[in-house]
């Protein structure tokens, strides 16, 4: 396990395994390192895989004062703790954290951004209110399912698959972190001008069956970052690392190691 102390004194940890160049994975909202284990197990022959637990999860600490900027700083602090350059893979909210952290660290080797969440319509915050009411009434499973279905747009089939996975209990424990991330994202202002300075190779993954909102955000980021490209994950949605881990891992290896399977 790797751990660092972020700027506000919060301890942030990563679980790691494998051999090869370092690959740092930044998970999205409602998940932790367990969520990525399916895909990570298929990457460890090629990379030393580090899966970050963002603040408020597993062995990572938390802080009573939350801000989205602290999330960015956490990822940057992890990156800066490596002696070598690092491949980075960020998903959804973690994709945004990865994007912002790449402006704060100088050792990013290459980026994969899987449907980075760069916006949340403030008109939809009423959905966040509903989720919070479920959490306040001690219904974490109902709250998590509501988030997945009504806010993210994950299919009923994918939700039922998620419920039978061994990490479901951990996801329920972290459900209280979801509303703060949604509200922070709703007030976040995406600055295209800032990201035009990114020069490391950048690939955006998008599910062929993902909601249009994610496809739109991918297109916006791709138009911003010079020489970036988009790879469509055919037949997949927002969570291909769970629904098709073999295919997903193969695409990561092809992207980062340039077809050296």
Indicate residue ranges for each PLM-predicted region.
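Glycine-rich His-Gly loop
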Residues: 25-28, 92, 207
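Short beta-to-alpha linker loops that shape the active-site pocket of alpha/beta-hydrolase fold enzymes
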Residues: 53-58, 117, 234-236
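Catalytic histidine-centered segment of alpha/beta-hydrolase-like enzymes
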Residues: 233-246
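Conserved serine/cysteine hydrolase catalytic core
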Residues: 170-223, 229-232
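Conserved alpha/beta-hydrolase catalytic His-Asp/Glu region
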Residues: 123-124, 139-179, 186
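Active-site loop/oxyanion-hole signature of alpha/beta-hydrolase fold enzymes
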Residues: 41, 50-89, 93, 250
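Conserved HGGG/HGGXW glycine-rich cap/lid loop of the alpha/beta-hydrolase fold
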Residues: 6-61
